[in-house]
UniProtKB/Swiss-Prot annotation:
Membrane topology: Peripheral membrane protein
Listed name of the protein: ATP synthase gamma chain
Assembly information from the UniProt record: F-type ATPases have 2 components, CF(1) - the catalytic core - and CF(0) - the membrane proton channel. CF(1) has five subunits: alpha(3), beta(3), gamma(1), delta(1), epsilon(1). CF(0) has three main subunits: a, b and c.
Natural source organism: Geotalea daltonii (strain DSM 22248 / JCM 15807 / FRC-32)
Keyword presence, Cell inner membrane: yes
Gene name of the encoded protein: atpG
Biological process (GO), any one: proton motive force-driven plasma membrane ATP synthesis
PROSITE patterns on file: ATPASE_GAMMA
Length: 287
């Protein structure tokens, strides 16, 4: 049986760990509220921009913009969005495994498939397993629209320079604190959502022309999609960490209970042993 001293030391250690996990849960809860607000604000904007692109692209040729042209040379880029920090359950590992499944299942469709990682954890997981084109490991330390725009511009330029012909992004979409959905989307070539057929749809007069507006809005669309994906990932990360730390705190409390019971039993056994020794000593003196 473990000594009283070692059991007490373990109880103190687990209590300290429990305090840390509880504090991390509270920090993640506060950050989650802000991140969730950002996601809720970004989704309608992204949806409306897609709706506008759908109207603009109606009756337009597929080659009306370089970003809509489909090429068949077979070079592709997969953007993998993870976090910079761990302690968030299977948040990063599950997404990286999904990225590897994509490479395995669809890799044969492309002559070259490279990966761009956003987030340190994704890079660390994939760097020795897949072809990494580039890693952005400090994006989340100061995430803003300008950062996403710079990422988008690099991706767009690579597409225009025909370094790759298709661009996909995989990330964790936020659903709730307990639920994050791994989501795969195609960024390039842009395929605007089809505008809904309306019996009495208004006829818009565009100034400047539709093609000019598409030329301006398509890069903006890529920027918004990447920014929204990053915001979704941040909210999902905090939700996953909050859940993981809550589970860790409960496990710590449960372990403290078991160790306390073990400590009390060991202490009781030690006291009983001492009493038996005293009684035996007294009996031997009498004898």
């Amino acid at each position: 049986m473990a000594s009283l001293k070692s059991i007490k030391k373990r109880i103190v250690s687990v209590k300290n760990t429990g305090q840390i996990t509880k504090a991390m849960k509270m920090v993640s809860a506060a950050k989650l509220r802000r991140a969730q607000e950002n996601v809720v604000a970004a989704r309608p904007y992204a949806a409306k921009l897609g709706e506008v692109l759908g109207r603009l692209s109606r009756n337009q040729d597929a080659d009306s913009s370089p970003l809509m042209i489909k090429r068949t040379t077979g070079k592709a880029l997969l953007i993998v969005v993870t976090s910079d920090r761990g302690l968030c359950g299977g948040f990063n590992a599950n997404l990286c495994k999904a990225a590897e499944r994509f490479v395995k299942e669809r890799g044969a469709e492309f002559t070259d498939l490279s990966i761009m990682t956003i987030g340190r954890k994704g890079y660390e997981f994939l760097k020795n397993r897949q072809k990494i084109r580039k890693n952005f490991g400090t994006v989340f330390s100061n995430l803003n629209y300008q950062t996403a725009a710079l990422l988008a511009q690099e991706v767009i330029q690579g597409y225009l320079d025909e370094e790759f012909d298709e661009v996909f992004i995989i990330y964790n979409a936020f659903r709730s604190v307990m639920s994050q959905d791994i989501t795969l989307e195609q960024l390039l070539p842009v395929t605007p959502p089809e505008a809904a057929d309306e019996e009495y749809a208004p006829e818009y007069i565009y100034e400047p022309s539709k093609s000019e507006l598409l030329g301006e809005l398509l890069p903006k669309h890529i920027e918004v999609q990447i920014f929204k994906s990053l915001l979704e990932s941040v909210a999902s990360e905090h939700g996953a960490r909050m859940t993981a730390m809550d589970s860790a705190s409960k496990n710590a409390n449960e372990m403290i209970g078991k160790l306390t019971l073990q400590y009390n039993r060991a202490r009781q056994a030690a006291i009983t042993t001492e009493l038996m020794e005293i009684i035996s000593g007294a009996e031997s003196i009498k004898g």
